[in-house]
Amino acid sequence: MSSPKRQSPISIDPYAQNGFGVRFEWGTNGAAAISAGASAMIVVDVLSFTTTLSVAVDAGIEVFPFRVRDATAATFAATRGAMLAVGRREAADTGVSLSPLSVRRAVADGTLKSSSKLVLPSPNGATVARQLAENGVPVIGASLRNASACANWAVRAVRGPIGVVAAGEWWPGESLRPSVEDLWGAGLIIDALAAAGAGPMSPKAAAARAAFRGVGRNLAMGLAACASGLELANDGYGDEIAVAAEVNVSRKVPLLTGESFKAA
């Protein structure tokens, strides 16, 4: 019996999701893989960077994403005339941190105004956004709060493939931990992109959409029960989860222009 003939090899990047109008991947490496040829990239970090970003942009605040919270971030903030978000414990009840509630409090008490600038460090969503911006692709910061607004804006504003990147979290040792809250957020955005006419979806994008549809009405419960939600609750910040679960309450689209996010 003769052995099967080997098919002629094809020349295609198996990771780029070329040929699909809606793409989906994880983290910085995934963002790099699917951004080539994309007309826009949407970054999702539900707990908490893009949720906090949406709260800030709703209030008219200009937000500078930054990779780490260290001396370089402080210098960067000073040269931009911006406030630097600090750690949650350092912020306590009065400072501004990565917590969306801290931004709401600061807006309510006048610490942050519509003319304010805020440097918001995050090893996840901010890092992905800055990397993509350095590559010259338009970047949108989306969460559950503004998923439909971001998707609709992207479909209207660009012609070509749209990539959605779930930022994910990190395991000890610096390896990516895919986080289900970002999968759900990406899935909602992909669902909204499809409803607005974008497509076709890559298999990975379709899987993310199915994950969001699968959680359905149990989304808020799922956010509280997932690993990232439990981490926040264990540290005493479980009340932030309700802000992340405010589905499609915002019509503002955070667009990264140069170094900072502003409402599109």
Task: Please give the residue ranges for each predicted region.
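Short glycine- and acidic-rich boundary segments immediately preceding or forming the N-terminal edge
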Residues: M1-V22
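Long, charged alpha-helical interface segments
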Residues: G95-P138, A157, L176-A264
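Extracytoplasmic/secreted cell-surface and envelope-processing proteins
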Residues: T51, P172-S175
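Residues that scaffold, gate, or flank divalent-cation-dependent active/transport sites
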Residues: R23-S35, F49-F64, D70-L118, G125-A126, ...
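Active/ligand-binding-proximal structured segments within catalytic/core domains
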Residues: A40-T52
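Short beta-strand segments
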Residues: V43-V44, A85-G87, L120-S122, A142, ...
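Catalytic cores of nucleophile-dependent amide-cleaving enzymes
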Residues: A133, S143-P172
